[in-house]
Amino acid sequence: MEDYKQRIKNKLNVVPMEPGCYLMKDRNDQVIYVGKAKKLRNRLRSYFTGAHDAKTTRLVGEIRRFEFIVTSSETESLLLELNLIKQYQPRYNILLKDDKSYPFIKITKEKYPRLLVTRTVKQGTGKYFGPYPNAYSAQETKKLLDRIYPYRKCDKMPDKLCLYYHIGQCLGPCVYDVDLSKYAQMTKEITDFLNGEDKTILKSLEERMLTASESLDFERAKEYRDLIQHIQNLTNKQKIMSSDKTIRDVFGYSVDKGWMCIQVFFIRQGNMIKRDTTMIPLQQTEEEEFYTFIGQFYSLNQHILPKEVHVPRNLDKEMIQSVVDTKIVQPARGPKKDMVDLAAHNAKVSLNNKFELISRDESRTIKAIEELGTQMGIQTPIRIEAFDNSNIQGVDPVSAMVTFIDGKPDKKNYRKYKIKTVKGPDDYKSMREVVRRRYSRVLNEGLPLPDLIIVDGGKGHMNGVIDVLQNELGLDIPVAGLQKNDKHQTSELLYGASAEIVPLKKNSQAFYLLHRIQDEVHRFAITFHRQTRQKTGLKSILDDIDGIGNKRKTLLLRSFGSIKKMKEATLEDFKNIGIPENVAKNLHEQLHK
């Protein structure tokens, strides 16, 4: 089976049974189709099983990968689908490129307005609400409002009263001089309802139901009860499309197994037009990691600042405000909080997919290690041991080792190391110390040696490890280095005396195994480092300076990166990031003692 088909098959197994939208992409990573589904897994699987018509067969033949976004309802999926189609204009979405395919409810712009269901939007002729998933949904909503409000029904004003007046569904403006303020109040209540504010209409119906019941008019009370239930069933909170046109970005995140996923929803003109997904290996607490991310998001990544930024309530608003120069909102309830929760839920789904795909791929690990051995020109590495260091500015340096046997993690043979002999942030010396300690003990206790050692790093790390193994311990074990790109993703495997790149295809099983190993050793190392920091506390020269607490210390480290950079900074540099002048002077003096 071709590699892309295998990847698609693997990913289909971890798609959730939830509503949402999906994006099909071709070999050039272009979006060629956008769709929605009540159950994402079932819909996506249907594309890759069974027979299809000619158009769908052509579409499936071009698909090389897919993405999906989870929503809270089928209606949200529709609204998001429309926004995504407008954004990407996929060539296979011919039938969905125009909003006219979907019905809207319209309040006409007349002296005595009418309620209409229409598929044509003409600006200046009235207010439009929607779109609705289908005509039935729009018609049911209109019928409900017709039963509650005696709005005008006739297209042209007749000369005499019609049936609607006699059954109480029209005030008869064709004959009577209807109070315009009363009509305007009805229009306001209908508008509020169509914008998702159903509390007013529900309260009114509940009062009518109670009055009818007290008057022993049980038939009328039952009718009001049925209307209330109908509204509750029909009303579907539409978080993806809002009548609020404020430009805002919505942030949500999830943390698991040493990784953090942050999702950003870009809301423009009430629509979610785009999202951004970022995976980050946790180096600090989740809160500190988020502050660092959001500060860089609008500076390094040059995203345009919106009018509002919405973030979870567990975060420190002042910390975020110090690095993001716009209004920070932490919604406590309602649709805005729902949107933050939805971003967090999508982040959780993304993390789950990452880990589930890893676990499902364990059945192919034997092939992976065979392929790895062939490409490196060594015997099949049955036992692989991988190392990674973790520290912040040289504080509490630690290292960790993970063991993979037959391409699968062997957790009982994982090891943790506190760096003992190295002062300051020196990755090379730290790696030499840990390798020396590990394999001295292996030799002394007669433990099994690995077939391959992998270090998280490049040529410098590899040479240091090889020197310790060969010249100090007399061991000849293959040593390889794994490097990452600027997105923290495994990018290349280095091997040999000159640390040459091993020609592995990025979509090969061997490369994916290396990605798993690097992720796992990194997770294990930073988890151990966080545990160590929690016990000892993060100590630095900043701890002894008056006016510098944890928040300002984090702000300084995030802004300057190191004590050395702070010593090079001016008073103005400190003031520019929000440090008060008196504290900045004290800080400057202490750093230059």
From Swiss-Prot:
PROSITE patterns: GIY_YIG (PS50164), UVR (PS50151), UVRC (PS50165). One of its GO terms (cellular component) is excinuclease repair complex. One of its GO terms (biological process) is nucleotide-excision repair. GO terms for molecular function: DNA binding; excinuclease ABC activity. Keywords: Cytoplasm, DNA damage, DNA excision, DNA repair, Excision nuclease, SOS response. Signal peptide: none annotated. Residues 17-94 form the GIY-YIG domain. NCBIfam families: uvrC (TIGR00194). This is UvrABC system protein C.
